[in-house]
Amino acid sequence: SMPDIDTDFDDEGRQKVIDYVVDKYGKEQVAQIVTYGTMAAKSSIKDVARVMDLPLSESNLLAKLVPDKPGTELNRCLHAPLTVKEGEKSLAEREGYQPEDIDNVKKLREIYKGNDLRAAVLHEAERLEGSIRNTGIHAAGIIIAPSDLTEIMPVATAKDSTLWVTQIEGSVIEEAGVLKMDFLGLKTLSILKTALELIKQNHGITIDLDLIPLDDAKTFNLYQRGETNATFQFESVGMQKHLRDLKPDKFADLIAMNALYRPGPMAYIPNFIERKHGRELIKYDLTVMEEILSDTYGITVYQEQVMLLSQKIAGFTKGDADVLRKAMGKKQKSVLDKMKAQFVSGAVKNGHPENVLEKVWTDWEAFAQYAFNKSHSTCYAYLAYQTAYLKAHYPGEYMSAVLNHAGSIDKI
């Protein structure tokens, strides 16, 4: 399949690129991509309650009983095991519900079993959950077709755009034979551009950001102090705390932190920090894993690491490894189950113990929930480093550029 092509431009440059693409290929061959919004657990309850004339106060109370965890499914709230494993994972295991969440789910189930209007609302909401509620336009996706799009797929006009909008969503659109690219407008690039102009104006210096050293002491001191306000990707309070503990001293540390600081992998940040400073033993399930995991102190952080390990341990081809990467990224359980058998048999042939392989695969399945690619993390860490470099060496000009692009008085 085609690679996933994401490109970032400064805010002003993005529209120029889109105009160029339209001019090169023709308006009939370029379109934006539709998005379909579906009814989630809480919204389905509120929508059904409104139609069935359940008072707003009762509707809100009903919706509040649904836990706030992202991805919560009403169907599982109403029917899945609460805390004991009974063939399928319980709400406590899979969703990670806390005792308070479980108590609310129990109340929800009691109402569901009743025969009043609230019960009727829950039954209808369960049936409608996942239905398409509205449409929108993908924030960055652009389609380029080899011929007139109307001959390939249904399209529509959009209220706020001169481009057509596809009626097939992005996850499957390439199967229609078109190229999908993401053109993102990134304010950070505009900030860098303005900062460089101010530095030239004030100091008579022209800086080429592609040539700045990646081991600059002043920049890493800024990271180690956690003084990263207004720098790209590293400005949150939580990240600043981790930076002060980590004390990064090489670019690879920034790449890893950029990948780890997200829901899911954040749990591994304390281990990453302790291992970097030698306060926690670095362990490898198999000795051959050290070569690939040593940069991240034995913790699997990137999709590329899994790809390389599957080739090294089980003799996967590059093609097999890429299928594994995609299955992890898209959480395709059926594909992962097939690849597990291939992985275990291939690794056993290479002399690795089956019980250890089971653990490795289980860890990878958990990793699949937050799998991140190193190439993306590297690009963003590089951009982040450029902002930190300018802040460390030219704080006045850099912060002026940040304020110029703040967009609102509240942000300033």
Regions found by a protein language model. Give the residues of each.
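Noncatalytic, beta-rich nucleic-acid-contacting surfaces in large DNA/RNA-processing enzymes
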Residues: 1-412
